[in-house]
Amino acid sequence: MSENPSLPSGDHELAKAYEFKEVEARWYQKWLEQKNFQATMDEGKPSFSIVIPPPNVTGVLHVGHALNNTMQDVLVRYKRMCGCNTLWVPGTDHAGIATQNVVERQLATESKSRHDLGREKFIERVWQWREEKGGTIINQLKHLGCSCDWDRERFTMDEGLSKAVRTVFVRLYKEGLIYKGDYIVNWCPRCKTALSDDEVEHEDTAGKLYHIRYPYADGSGHVVVATTRPETMLGDTGVAVHPDDARYSHLRAIGIRLPLTDRTIPVVYDHHVEREFGTGALKVTPSHDRNDYEIGLRHNLERVKVMDDSGIMNEAAGPYAGLERFACRKQIVADLEAQGFLEKIEEYAHAVGQCYRCKTVVEPTTSLQWFVSVKPLAAQAVAAVRDGRTAIHPKTWYNTFYAWMDNIRDWCISRQIWWGHQIPAWTCDDCAHFMVEEHAPAACEKCGSAKLTQETDVLDTWFSSALWPFSTLGWPDDTKELKFFYPTSVLITSFDILFFWVARMMMMGIHIMGEVPFKDVYLHALVRDKHGKKMSKSTGNVIDPLVVMAEYGTDALRFTLTAFAAQGREIKLAEERIEGYRHFINKIWNAARFALMHIKECDPAISKDIDPAALPLAHRWILHRLNQAITETRQALDDYRFNDAASVLYQFVWNEFCDWYLEWIKSDLYGDNATAKAQAQGVLLAVLENTLKLLHPITPFVTEEIWHVLPGERTSIMVEAFPTPNPAWDDPEAAELAALFMGIVGGIRNIRSEAMIHPSAEIEVLIVCHDETKHAGLTSLAGSLKTLTRTGTMAVQKEGTRPKGAASYLYTDIEIFVPLAGLVDVDKEQAKLKKDQDKTEAELARCQGKLANEKFMANAPEEVKAKEREKIGEMQAKLEKIKAGMERLEELR
């Protein structure tokens, strides 16, 4: 037996109850000390590599993290046991906006702002915060049991990754794929930074649609335009109509007078306008709307920006300058109404863009920003998916991926914050020459001046994350890890960052490395509450993984999440399900305790020298079923069908190994037949060993603890070989006969239950089986049948009829009879049945009355009526059973 710090040498016992807190802490520390998670680069083994989706350094483990990392760990532990050189790279993301917000809030408690500190001191303060608090989520991932190679932990702002970021930026810039320009962007007035399209979340909002009269410049009439943002009209520089719309052809030479101002703006004719929508006229605000920006470019319209970076109206807003944008909206509407320009206001539901970090309403605005020209990169990524170099699971995401990539817009990568990768670009203060370099130049390459100013913007956090699969392996250096583990094997992540992150890693990996970053992408669903609603603190339906791990144990949470991780299906999680799987963990524990009572003194070799041909049915059947469980579990994990793997193991462990096999072999284990006992011990140990290994990737702690109390010297279970099917154990005939055996046992137990025979009472059983083969099989199993059903006398006949006063059960074509004379109190049981009959008849009448009620039938929802009909069917069937029971009892008089 191996060294187990919880057990004295030679002590092959498990505690009565599984104390998971002590076990989890002890074994995780032991794994770290033994360096069980470290990757090796043995050329003789296949490699399996996976990079963790780096959680934000500000993060705290939530149930989505728990799901994602459990799935990764299941796969990593499985591949490690399959003999792969397995690398799981951990790390955290610097989370530019989120982290800066956290530290700014910290400063606010000291009555300071980042501007009081200045950029350099503020960055120092963020690094200080990261050193003090940034490891929280890493420690929580360890609590979850994650077997990452922690010696390779990375951070998106560490020096190695910073070098990779600078190298890629400069390369893309010199290739013409990064450029700087004044374009329309998504602007967050709270964070005071640009956001990429993917960082804007659209929320359905009940708003208003304002219909405004725009007078013709010559006073001859007006056109009505509609907008949800009347405050932006101050930046209008045109009204657009369709070129073929005859209603407005006369306005070409007249123009429009902009309400509330003294400005005249032109009418432009553009095919973007839909003639049938509204009045067919569209206000054009090039500085505050993406489509208007494009129209403005086509018609060379002036750009008038009417808000500053904080969402405050600026001097271009005239008398409205200084008003916050939504306050300005109210004032504008009031003034439009007062001056007769407001036609009407309609209630209007529409999607409003919000900052993904602070939920502030985003303002489209023109701004000088840095962009990546992504179309050529996207084309390479799409080609890689189409030709199968990267596969997406589940397949339902292919079309979504193609549609998004085909319509992708250039990626705004600059952010107006301080925390992040500062863009490696410099401007000469003397000659204005512009340079983009990996390292700060000593002097201007044009005039030689040493007075250089670096670009103040930082890169979008997703830029560094896009390089994660190869930057974490040492690129741009030519490392051994890069050669051995890139491309990585699979990426497991939630579907909601398919475009934030997955697509960008695809684009960068293919362009920079010449190879896809991963061969498979597995996209899992989001975790919702048991009703399918989004979890949120405000609704109080959040399941905190840290709380449930403390309550039910890490293995119970991991098994629950694995069992619920069906491909393409929403995950509805309830705490009671976690509690239910805690019972499963206890079932494993108790089964192991029972087994140890009988195998603790055995030679461990007995589990290796098994000749199935010489074994009784129980052993041949369980080995056959174990073989099937091995095959199905391996196939499920290879196909990323995590829930199917959990389902196979749950069924095998609970229903077959524990409920059937252990009960079936008790007579051998407790009996005096030495040969039967030795056979039972050998198979029991073999099945338990293999079952623990099958379970280990999902439930690592309880399996490791049990593994070390089995007979013999043992290393960690995680370095054991994952079970492979044994052809010698395949035995379909045993499976067929065992199914017959279980059906008969189930039938006899059903009679006991229905007839309310006391569990300890011995019964007589008559089995009538006409089939020659089945008859022979049941005859050979009569001893086991008697033991499992507490039967005193059992007869297996080819012909026979029901004895008087006997209860019966039909299993396929086999009749089972149990004479009830002397086993039941006829008067007492008849009284019980009569009471149940009266109650059921009353309930049946109530339900039938409902369905006969015209008012109920007219007003009740269809599903309610269907439920009542279902109840009627159930009660009628119940009454039939009661009637049969009473007739059977009457025969006993």
Language-model segments: residues:
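Residue patterns forming the tRNA-binding/recognition surfaces of aminoacyl-tRNA synthetases
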Residues: 2-8, 12, 17, 26, ...
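Feature 926 captures the class I aminoacyl-tRNA synthetase adenylation module centered on the KMSKS loop
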Residues: 3, 211, 403-463, 467, ...
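N-terminal catalytic cores of NTP/NDP-binding nucleotidyl/phosphoryl-transfer enzymes
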Residues: 40-103, 156, 165, 225-228, ...
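Short, solvent-exposed turn/loop segments enriched in Gly/Ser/Thr/Pro and often Arg
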Residues: 43-45, 53-54, 87-100, 153-161, ...
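Alpha-helical support elements that line or immediately flank enzyme active sites
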Residues: 65-67, 290-295, 504-512, 649
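Secondary-structure transition/capping motifs at alpha-helix termini
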Residues: 77-85, 106-119, 139, 143-148, ...
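Catalytic alpha/beta core of large soluble enzyme barrels
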Residues: 85, 230-310, 337, 378, ...
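Active-site-adjacent "gating/activation" loops or surface patches in catalytic cores
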Residues: 263-268, 454-489, 655, 659-662
